[in-house]
Amino acid sequence: MQTSMSPVYLPSLSERHFRRIETTRRPCKFILAGLGVASLAAFGISAHAADYQPVHCAVHAAYVGSPLHAPVDITATPPVPNKALPAETTRRLDVTYERIQAFTAASAITAAVAIPGKGLWQQTSAPTDAPRLFWASAGKTFTAVVILQLAEEGKLSLDDPVSLWVPDVPNGDVATVRDLLAHTSGLFSANEDLKAHADPRYRDPAANLAIARRHGAMFCPGGRWRYSNTGYDLLGEIVRKVDHRSIDVAITTRIIAPLGLTSMRALVPGGGAVGVAPLTAVHEKPIDPSWAGAAGPIVSDAADMTRFWAALLGGRLLSDGTVRTMARKLYPMFDPGTYYGLGIMVFDVTDDSRSIRWIGHAGGTPGASAVVAYSPSDNAIVAVALTGDAVSVPAANLLLKALGPPK
């Protein structure tokens, strides 16, 4: 079952649109330019064990959730040349960046707008000894790309049961690698455990899986959609077993080094975050970015993030067919207008009475917010990451609007 675009309004610039909304019982909720997305350790929602009864499933379930989005066609984009955008465009982006800095009051921020085939604008304000920013769940796309590369190489199948690679996973004989990528496995996300959330320390994938086992599966694989950071933990473990290297080494070897992304780094899970702008939050103690593991492994400036997405959309990391597969089956997420495929998000929104579609990924955790997205109507890739209690999506929208009317 499919549905047409479900619009969400992207408001104009005002200070309140950059601020998170605090809730009484759930960790913290942001306004993503009108998109209310709950956040806990990079997109999670606080849950109690009593919220559901664990299920044991013998077969993969038919999807019974809210209507799917129609497949989104991803057209290959040319590379981004290493040159500046026209002077007037650069001036407008610079002015917009200054406004964003003032409204967000971010202690560190990096932003970039890349136009494939034309050029790049970028600005970063960060400590000189910590110039990289944390991209939180926007780094999930990197983990997904490695898994999809391994599938193209015939080293695994997206339809492999998870139990083929990782033992003792709830419904692991039924849930597939594809389910982990799409968040349809039913696997409990360990960061939703209230006791674990209150215990600020690194937990490796085995510890997170133990928490997920204790809670049990939330639904039969394929039957519904629910975000699971632990599912991406398991994808990192699958990479380790199939590719014989950790997720950080696999991302570096397969993506960062070949593309020459000199500012970008894949963090060693639990290995600390030296050289990364400190996360700052008023109401909740931030995590060490390296604790996110395969669920959010990337630190970088915004320019390299746009270069990665240009390479992905341009077929330089995966075949065009595989890239299209990432947006073929799109599940509705937390809010109207947001959908999830295989390691990517689709945003369908409205702004000033015009429809906007973004293809990318957002991320958030206490003390950091990030988004990277390709806007087909603008033929541009925008990326923003910042620290503090503000949010990144309104900033990204303002930067795209500074380019002028959509093409």
Q: Could you tell me what each predicted segment is?
A:
Residues 173-364:
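Short, surface-exposed loop or secondary-structure junction motifs
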Residues 369-388:
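Short, well-ordered beta-strand elements
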Residues 1-26:
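N-terminal secretory signal peptides that target proteins for export/translocation
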Residues 72-80, 84, 103-107, 115, ...:
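Active-site-proximal loop and beta-strand segments within enzyme catalytic domains
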Residues 51, 60, 65-67, 349-354, ...:
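Short, gly/Ser/Thr-rich active-site loops of penicillin-recognizing serine hydrolases
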Residues 33-42:
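Bacterial N-terminal signal peptides
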Residues 47-49:
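Boundary at the C-terminal end of the N-terminal hydrophobic targeting segment
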Residues 94-129, 135, 197-199, 344-347, ...:
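A short, well-structured edge-of-sheet supersecondary motif
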